[in-house]
Curated annotation (Swiss-Prot):
The gene is Ptger2. Residues 49-66, 134-152, 225-262, 324-357 are cytoplasmic. It comes from Rattus norvegicus (Rat). Keywords: Cell membrane, Disulfide bond, G-protein coupled receptor, Glycoprotein, Membrane, Receptor, Transducer, Transmembrane, Transmembrane helix. It is a multi-pass membrane protein. One of its GO terms (molecular function) is prostaglandin E receptor activity. This is Prostaglandin E2 receptor EP2 subtype. GO terms for cellular component: plasma membrane. Gene3D superfamilies: Rhodopsin 7-helix transmembrane proteins. Residues 1-24, 93-112, 178-199, 287-299 are extracellular. Residues 235-255 are annotated as: Disordered.
Amino acid sequence: MDNSFNDSRRVENCESRQYLLSDESPAISSVMFTAGVLGNLIALALLARRWRGDTGCSAGSRTSISLFHVLVTELVLTDLLGTCLISPVVLASYSRNQTLVALAPESRACTYFAFTMTFFSLATMLMLFAMALERYLAIGHPYFYRRRVSRRGGLAVLPAIYGVSLLFCSLPLLNYGEYVQYCPGTWCFIQHGRTAYLQLYATVLLLLIVAVLGCNISVILNLIRMQLRSKRSRCGLSGSSLRGPGSRRRGERTSMAEETDHLILLAIMTITFAVCSLPFTIFAYMDETSSRKEKWDLRALRFLSVNSIIDPWVFVILRPPVLRLMRSVLCCRTSLRAPEAPGASCSTQQTDLCGQL
């Protein structure tokens, strides 16, 4: 009885606390802010170089930037904007030794932080879903993709996602749900236990993660089918036909390699978001007393914030040479597991997945 009373008093103290405790340090928040801004700026610089290369291409040449990279650019911009709009509020709280509730009249800083946090977390997941859907259509339904999907249409994805996120995350401002302050007083989020909005928000994120994983699995299966069909067609060719349109076969291998690179990048970003969202999902479905006692609220926020920091670094680290290395490892394992057909004339060639001649 006394423990539950103390827990409720602690919750009320966190929601109304005006000053930070003396042992609170801004070190973690500062490192996260610096890493987030630096990673996103480097990723944007690399993407800008690709955009400049695309602009310099002649009218008849192949463009160097794809719809997938348009969506990656929009994801990086979203992560950078979220980092720059959220972290400075936390650093201001530490510098003034005041909680977010006390930082501005009528808890405006607390409401601002909670709204931007929910908005950019949802927008990031919607961007990943858009990227996964683009890959699914490009690989699984190429005819529809060529006729209906364009790079110009990809530019409309960002405002559409922002519009949906704005409507959904504005519900607490319309009295469906409420934003409150959590310990140690440097962050605010959806109130736990008063309405079903927190569970609804977590469920939407979970459904998006499942949808992205479903799209990725479908793309993997389609790539495997394409690889097997291409290998069978090469094996069935006679020696005279093998001396035919070599540039076409080279283009097919390059296309397969690019699709595999896109899939690797998207898969790692999706796994990262799924791992970062797991503590938040657990927190949303826990009862309020247990979540506070086990400090799941603070873990959920930190994991959710880390995602916008990791995403750009994934893109920065997974440059083409690294992706080629990963593809070669995959090809090596595939070739070791697959038995060689005796007398096959194409056994000395690399598979399309490798993207190499």
